[in-house]
Each structure stands twice: as C-alpha cells, then as structure tokens.
Design a protein with these regions (language model features):
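Structured catalytic-domain cores with a bias toward divalent-metal coordination
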Residues: 3, 15-501
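Bacterial N-terminal signal peptides
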Residues: 4-12
Length: 501
C-alpha cells in the first residue's frame, strides 16, 4: 500500500519537471553554472557509451598538451568487452608523483560515474602544476558488461562490490592485478545511490527521499591501523568542505536495515568485500563516494557529475600538497604493531537523519537506532604474526584464480607455529548467495613440516592478510568457503610468531 502512496506523491509533485524528483528537484538539486565537456553533455538523451568514453580519453592529450595518456588493457570481460584503463601524467612529472587510482561504474546501473571520473580528469589536467605532481590510473568503467545493460551486476550476476575480497569475478581479478602493480597511495571509487527506496516509504506520512548529494564511505575496519583511518577521515573532511563551497550536501554513508521487524540505520562500513575497506587494507587512503542518482535518469546530471569531480579533486589536491606527509602515514600504518582484532563490540546509538519529506516537500529530521561502525570497539585481539603459512595442498583452483597469493613464495618448513583448531562451526549464505562457514577457532601450538606458501607480514598488503587468514573474520578464506573445515580439525594454514628457520 505504501508503494502506491509513494507513487501518488511523486505524481503530485512532478509537475512539468522531468525525473522522479519532480518540481522540488530544481529547488533542492539545482545544476551548477559550469560547463562540462564530457560525452553525456554533448547529447540530450542517455549517458556516455563505452565507445564515447574511450574516444574521450584518446583525445585527452589533444585537448591537454600537458598530458601524457597511456591506454592500459586490464583484460576481456565474459561478454568479450575490453576493460580499459588509462595511465595519465603531466607533461613534466616530478620524480615521484603521488599515485592515485580512480574508478567508476563498478555497479553498471550507476551510469553518471564515468562522466564524474572524466570531469575529474579534466579538472586535474587544467592545473598543469597539479598534473605534474600526480599520476592517475583511471578505470572509468569497471564493470563493462553491466554498464552496457545499465545493470548493477556483472554478466555473471555478481555484485562486484561484494567480491573484492575473494575475487571470484574475473572483472575484480583484472582490476586487482593492475591495482597491485600500480600500488596507489590514494584510491577513489565513484558510485551512485538510489534516493527512492521501498523502505523509505515507511518514514513520515507519505514517505521520504534522500537529501544528500554525496555520501562518503571510508572505513571503520579496526584492522586498518588507526593512523590510516584518521588520515582517511581528514581527506573526507576536506572533500566535504570543498563540496559545501558549491552548495553540495554531504554525509557519512548510511542505509536502513531490518532489526527484528523494525528499521534502524547502519552508518559507515567495515567490510573488506567493498572497495572502501579493501583498498585501505592495501595501505592507501581510500574512499567510496556515493552520489544521489540511481533511478533518476538525467535529472540533476550536471550537479551529480560536478559534485563527484569536486570531491575527487579535493582528494587529489590534498595528496599532491604534501606527499611526504601522506607517505609517512602510509609507512607508519604498514609498520603498525597491532595484531588482528577477531571479535568486536558494536554499541547501538540514537541518531537523527535529514530527509526530504514527500508530504511536506521540505526537509524533515527523523530519529533511528543506529549501528555506527565508527564506534566499534575491539573485544578480542590476537598477537601480530610474522608470517602465515598455507599448506601447499590447500592452494585450490579458486584461490589461484583469485590472484590473492600470486606473488608469495613456497618453502619447505620444519617450524614451530600456532594451528587454528575449529571449536564451533555453522553454515549460511553470504554475499552473492555464496555458501559461508562461521567458525570459532582456538590456537594450538604445533610443529609444521612440508611445503607451504609463505605470507610475510612485512609484505604489502599486510592488513589484508588478517582479513584472509583469521578464520573468525567475516571475509576470511574459511568464512567464504574457500577453505573447508570441520569441528575438532585444524585448518590447513598456520600463524608463525618467530623468524622462519
């Protein structure tokens, strides 16, 4: 019934304006007085096609003689499309430019994001000094098959932003291969979010719609060292300030969730399945930027694209302004001595959120119980190992295809170690309907012999190894079913707390 009320409300306010926001769209989301030259703005219908995006990048060095653009082929998608990237430098780059990764359209229905990425590139290259201080690796369409059909998922039906950890989708395998080669110091992932949701019909008398232009998703994962989380927060604050100067409204990312039949909010994130956390676990300043847009057609398109670029530019400018500070933070994060947190306490708090009330056609504030990921508190922490050692026989085809352990060496060991013995185990379904195993393990001293894949905590991405090998964590090899287990048995990998013999 509430769906019908929401639909009638939208018709009532729509007037002669286009798009779901109707007549109040121009009030709350007016377009800025700027010129944007990306492909979508050279036509009156639709968004930039993959071909138009590629042509635009091919012509960048003509429009910007100060730019050097190298096309990078990441690979070929299941539907035979080329996944393309572009490595961009200024004409006179410094000796050690800040490496910045930029991507869009990981979800194929978020169709304005490639133009946001292109407009960001325009802004960077328009400032020759800035362009010479950074090196960009740009993947404007990270899900070409989904983008061609304006569908969120990949050709195989996978949500690629729930697959960043296990990398079962070939798209993520290709992305992470180039990502790891590039080794970015800053990583930006541009998304769009849906401002009209079915659960929003339960708020207010006739439902609400989203008020914020952009929402930031950094990471509150406590296995990311605190020094890096604080640096990411500083970048987000600077970007929010830059957006506000243009009248764009920003907020930390929040989304409704069910709590035993009642609605509460989830504020922030900590999941390594998603780029925001996963890229930060690779030891870089990482943020996912959500822009109000899915289901909006071309409504407020200039505002959407420009706000993405302004936010991205703030990240680029801050990194370029003091690269020594950025690198000192990343070095401190890599050397952080804290071991893996395997159990957390997450308190519930009350917070108020601003929406656009469809009955009042004005803003309104509503209170909700909230799971605030920024307030998570470590409850159980294991010591930091020097190495993890995976029995070579456990290196399954799925694990090999993921590329997670592609650069690790194999050694014959006779070594003291701590085994993980399974004390509890339950099964369920996780992201992309994949089977999961939830376990609790105890560590047992043992001596291991044989051939093992060695993962050193001195090697990047060291904090990613926590997420993979600590079995209790939500995105571990065990939780995702890549390592089978049973109660009373030991897992086929070990933590080593001393130098290897």
């Amino acid at each position: 019934m509430r769906w019908g009320i929401l639909a009638l409300g939208l018709l009532a306010v729509s007037g002669t304006s286009s798009g779901p926001d109707g007549s109040f769209g121009a009030v709350f989301f007016p377009d800025p007085a700027v010129e944007i030259l990306t492909p979508a703005f050279q036509k009156s219908k639709g968004f930039s096609s993959e071909e138009e995006v590629t042509q635009w990048f091919d012509q960048v060095s003509i429009r910007f003689p100060n730019a050097s653009v190298q096309r990078v082929k990441l690979g070929t998608t299941p539907r035979g499309r080329i996944m393309g990237g572009f490595r961009i430098n200024g004409s006179n780059p410094g000796a050690n430019p800040v490496r910045i990764w930029v991507q869009g359209a990981l979800h194929g229905d978020e169709q304005a994001t490639p133009d946001g990425v292109m407009h960001l590139v325009e802004m960077v290259l328009s400032d020759q000094e800035l362009a010479n201080r950074v090196e960009l690796m740009v993947v404007p369409i990270a899900n070409p098959d989904g983008y061609a059909r304006a569908m969120r998922q990949s050709a195989s039906g996978m949500d690629l932003n729930r697959d960043m950890m296990m990398r079962q989708g070939p798209e993520n395998q290709m992305i992470m291969s180039v990502f790891n080669e590039f080794r970015p110091e800053v990583a930006l992932d541009f998304h769009e979010y849906r401002p009209y949701r079915s659960d929003f019909t339960e708020i207010g008398s006739r439902g609400v719609t989203a008020y914020f232009d952009n929402m930031f998703l950094g990471s509150s994962n406590v296995n990311i060292p605190e020094v890096l989380r604080a640096e990411i927060a500083a970048y987000v604050d600077g970007a929010a300030t830059a957006a506000a100067q243009w009248g764009y409204r920003t907020h930390a990312y929040f989304v409704p969730e069910d709590d035993r039949g009642s609605m509460r909010m989830r504020l922030g994130s900590a999941s390594s399945r998603s780029t925001a956390t996963n890229y930060a676990l690779h030891n870089c300043v990482s943020a996912l930027i959500e822009t109000r847009g899915v289901g909006q057609g071309r409504s407020a398109l200039k505002r959407r694209v420009h706000s993405m670029a302004i936010i991205g530019l703030a990240f680029v400018q801050k990194a370029a302004a003091d690269p020594d500070h950025l690198r000192a933070v990343l070095d401190a994060a890599h050397r952080d001595p804290m071991g893996p947190v395997i159990e957390l306490h997450q308190p519930i708090e009350q917070r108020r959120y601003t929406f656009i009330d469809l009955a009042k056609r004005d803003t309104a504030s509503f209170g909700f119980a909230t799971r605030n990921y920024a307030q998570m508190q470590p409850r159980v922490r294991r010591p930091k190992p020097k190495f993890y050692a995976l029995d070579k026989s456990a290196l399954t085809p799925e694990l090999i295809r993921s590329g997670l352990l592609v650069n690790q060496e194999t050694k014959s060991l006779n070594q003291k170690a701590m085994a993980y013995e399974v004390a509890q185990r339950t099964e369920g379904l996780g992201a992309n309907n994949q089977r999961t195993q939830k376990v609790v393990c105890t560590q047992v001293p043992t001596t291991i012999t044989g051939d093992f894949v060695i993962i050193s905590m001195d090697d990047l991405p060291s904090r990613l190894w926590y997420e993979l090998f600590e079995p209790e964590l939500d995105n571990s090899l065990v939780r995702n079913g890549l390592i089978e287990c049973s109660i009373g048995k030991q897992l086929p990998y070990y933590a080593i707390y001393e130098e290897i013999n």
